[in-house]
Design a protein with these regions (language model features):
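Accessory alpha-helical/coil subdomains and C-terminal extensions
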Residues: 5-8, 12-16, 36-48, 163-245, ...
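Short acidic, glycine-rich surface-loop motifs adjacent to enzyme active sites
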Residues: 84-99, 241-253
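A short helix->loop->beta-strand "cap" motif at the edges of active sites that frequently abuts
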Residues: 87, 112-115, 269-273
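Short Gly/Thr/Asp-enriched flexible loops that form oxyanion-binding sites at enzyme active sites
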Residues: 92-114, 256-265
């Protein structure tokens, strides 16, 4: 009987806390991304028994320094690895600050049903009790699992599996720092033992209309945080500095003051796409609820938080969509 070959998993290391190091095992301060991919792999006992591993140091940054250029390069690399059949699954080690944004971007532009799994850690590798090694073990296990196919990009942290569409960071320091409000977990992974609870219900990866092939830059989209007595001149400043889109992290159901709403309507009339999201951690932003989106020319974000709304709006603008199709996209994705 022929032996079943081990799955091939390629690790793309981008830096982050999982590769961080501090002055001592109990020092809360540390530098992100100082460990290389080989040290990360060698630090996880039994990892090479899960899959045939290859790895590369894609970048060495804290995820606060992730940017559009790195996203485009990362998407191109993932798509190239799959197109060349060089991996059955890919793990991306990443800082937690912007993991949800990188994950959602890849969720919309990777053109394969093979698993892409983001992981990271809340504690640096030098910590007294680092969470990174087990997170990496679980992530490689998921990337090796045929059951992970066609579930889009998965974020694997602290034994939980999240869809990149739904996940958000909810704590600055807790090890249990990520939640998927409303939608809930995709599943769990405990010491490599995987259970799935559901599959994503919105289009993703090979089912997504979005592609960044040949794209060298992303449109500028700004996020403005709404608050009591918010000055409307922030809207004018954003538009004057070249933003093609503005996402409002609105109060409640995506609300803003009358003055801000009128100013947003003015820039929307001049071609800037305005998306209303919410600074609240869960719930939908409905269209034409308290604000007249039809009259103002706004887009309602539906279920996407401000940072995810920015990603989708960038891709919509890069695809040349107008406000009507962009609203449709927010309802679909």
């Amino acid at each position: 009987m022929d032996e079943i070959p081990m799955p091939r998993v390629h690790i793309l290391a981008t830096g982050g806390t999982i590769a961080g190091s501090g002055a001592s095992s109990v020092d809360p301060g540390y530098r992100s991304g100082v460990m290389g991919v080989s040290a990360l792999v060698d630090g996880v006992v039994g990892l090479r028994s899960v899959a045939v591993l290859t790895g590369e140091q894609f970048s060495q940054v804290g995820s606060q320094d992730m940017n559009d250029g790195l996203w485009l390069s990362l998407a191109a690399r993932v798509n190239a690895l799959f197109a060349a059949d060089e991996a059955d699954g890919i793990v991306i080690t990443h800082g937690t600050d912007t993991a949800e944004e990188t994950g959602f971007f890849l969720h919309l532009v990777v053109k394969s049903d093979r698993p892409v799994v983001l992981t990271g850690s809340m504690r640096p590798a030098s910590s007294l009790s680092p969470d990174g090694p087990l997170n990496l073990f679980n992530a490689v296990s998921v990337a090796s699992d045929p059951g992970a196919r066609d579930r889009g990009v998965i974020v694997a942290l602290n034994d939980d599996l999240h869809s990149a569409r739904d996940v958000t960071k909810s704590s600055t320091t807790d090890v249990q720092a990520f939640i998927s409000p409303g939608a809930g977990l995709l599943g769990t992974a405990s010491y490599g033992r995987i259970r799935y609870f559901r599959s994503p219900t919105h289009p993703h990866t090979s089912g997504s209309e979005f592609s960044v092939e040949g794209l060298v830059a992303m449109p500028r989209v700004d996020i403005l945080y709404a608050h009591a007595n918010m000055p409307a001149d922030l809207v004018r400043a954003s538009a004057s500095l070249g933003a093609q889109g503005i996402v409002i992290a609105g109060m409640g159901n995506g609300n803003v003051s009358t003055d801000v709403a009128n100013t947003l309507a003015d820039v929307a009339g001049k071609g800037v796409i305005v998306v209303r999201s919410s600074r609240v951690s869960s719930g939908d932003v409905g269209r034409n609820i308290e604000l007249d989106d039809d009259g103002f020319g706004f887009v309602a974000s539906d279920q996407l938080n401000p940072q995810k709304s920015r990603v989708l709006l960038q891709l919509c603008l890069a695809s040349g969509l107008g406000s009507g199709p962009i609203q449709d996209a927010f309802f679909r994705y």
